[in-house]
């Protein structure tokens, strides 16, 4: 695959996916590493290892299945580690990573997770995806409050190109935003130093208490808040892939790289939706090219390690938010359409959508999981009670 020979919108979809992933949560990983007492150099090494791991896994799975399979670090898992690693050492942290990733591999080997994912109705998966992405759409238009000129210009460029050259609409918005930001002096490039920092091996230290209090919650949060939405997102986008091999591969890769700071590698949901949308490629069978491009950008991000985080800080937050919202707009509308198509499933889908969009967190598990649970309960109750009335 030659990156330069791919359609520009396809390549840019991969770039936007990686950009959104790093911009939205890289800082949380830095905080988690700091909680374990990591130095700036060690943190940069973590970022390098994570970028390379995501690049390898994304490219391998995408090329193997010829489907847009994007991997990511677990953002909810990183948030959990910010508090869970307080007062612990780096060897303690690595021991926690190994236990959590081993549990993910075990979940894939047994096939339990795959069986659970097969029973989720398509309408609920689509509703959950729409609920996950809703905040990105709201954030995008919320940026007009503080950055009307830049974000308004991005929106106008997107609208114009959506009419005359739809595949280049997101690119036009990106260029417009950067142009305005540079003109306004809001891009601080002076503090960025591009250099590669390689990760160092940290021998693990295992503790039953730490495994129970941190590793098991990390495993549960990663599966419920990241892998479940990620698999459901693929399902909602029309890609039916075997789930257990995905869990085994990502879990094993993270397990092997745990001593270098890779606390988790899981199936992406939000960023994957960018590569699975019609904007990435009009032909669904060719959208894997966008994910492959994202894999290459992951490797580049990993090569430069901590410098990527500095770049994210240099770009205006509102630019990233507007770009993400516009890139996900077609996916949001498509997911809502799929969720509400069947009248008999509509109420349950709305429940799943609203619970997911609410941001509800219970027992450290995010709203995407609870959206599926609430929607599933609604689906079971409502479809059962409506069958007699329909037949009568």
Residue map of PLM features:
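Helix-loop-helix hairpins and the membrane-proximal interhelical loops
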Residues: 1-44, 171-243, 391-392
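Helix-loop-helix junctions within the multi-pass membrane cores of secondary transporters/permeases
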Residues: 2-4, 10-29, 48-129, 241-329
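Alpha-helical membrane-protein architecture signal
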Residues: 8-11, 153, 212-213, 248-252, ...
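Residue-level signal for transmembrane alpha-helical positions in Major Facilitator Superfamily
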Residues: 23-24, 149, 225, 267, ...
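Predominant activation on well-ordered alpha-helical scaffold segments within soluble catalytic domains
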Residues: 29-33, 57, 78-82, 138, ...
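Membrane-embedded alpha-helical modules
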Residues: 86-192, 293-392
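Membrane-interface helix-boundary motifs at transmembrane edges
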Residues: 162-165, 238-239, 281-285, 343
């Amino acid at each position: 695959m030659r990156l330069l020979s791919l359609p520009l919108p396809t390549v840019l979809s991969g770039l936007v996916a990686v950009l959104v992933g790093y911009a939205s949560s890289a800082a949380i990983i830095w905080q988690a590493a700091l909680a374990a007492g990591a130095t700036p150099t060690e943190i940069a090494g973590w970022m390098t290892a994570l970028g390379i791991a995501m690049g390898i896994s994304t490219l391998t799975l995408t090329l193997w299945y010829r489907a847009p399979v994007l991997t990511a670090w677990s953002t909810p898992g990183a948030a959990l580690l910010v508090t869970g690693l307080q007062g612990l050492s780096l060897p303690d942290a690595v021991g926690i990573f190994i236990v959590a990733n081993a549990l993910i591999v075990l979940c894939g080997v047994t096939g339990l997770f795959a069986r659970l994912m097969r029973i989720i109705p398509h309408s609920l998966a689509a509703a959950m995806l729409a609920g996950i992405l809703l905040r990105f759409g709201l954030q995008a238009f919320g940026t007009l409050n503080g950055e009307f000129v830049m974000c308004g210009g991005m929106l106008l460029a997107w609208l114009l190109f959506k009419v005359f050259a739809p595949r280049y609409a997101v690119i036009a918005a990106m260029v417009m935003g950067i142009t305005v930001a540079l003109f306004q002096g809001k891009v601080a490039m002076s503090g960025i130093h591009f250099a590669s920092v390689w990760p160092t091996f940290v021998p693990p230290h295992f503790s039953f208490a730490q495994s129970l209090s941190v590793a098991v919650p990390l495993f549960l949060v990663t599966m419920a808040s990241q892998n479940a939405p990620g698999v459901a997102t693929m399902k909602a986008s029309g890609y039916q892939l075997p789930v257990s091999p995905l869990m085994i591969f990502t879990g094993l890769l993270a397990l092997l790289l745990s001593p270098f700071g890779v606390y988790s590698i899981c199936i992406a949901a939000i960023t994957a939706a960018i590569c699975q949308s019609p904007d990435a490629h009009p032909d669904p069978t060719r959208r894997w090219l966008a994910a492959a491009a994202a894999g290459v950008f992951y490797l580049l991000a990993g090569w430069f390690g901590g410098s990527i985080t500095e770049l994210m800080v240099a770009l205006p937050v509102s630019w990233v938010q507007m770009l993400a919202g516009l890139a996900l707009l077609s996916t949001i509308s498509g997911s809502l359409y799929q969720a509400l198509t069947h009248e008999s499933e509509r109420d349950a889908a709305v429940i799943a959508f609203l619970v997911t969009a609410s941001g509800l967190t219970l027992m450290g598990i995010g709203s995407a999981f609870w959206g599926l649970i609430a929607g599933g309960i609604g689906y079971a109750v409502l479809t059962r009670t409506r069958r007699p009335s329909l037949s009568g």
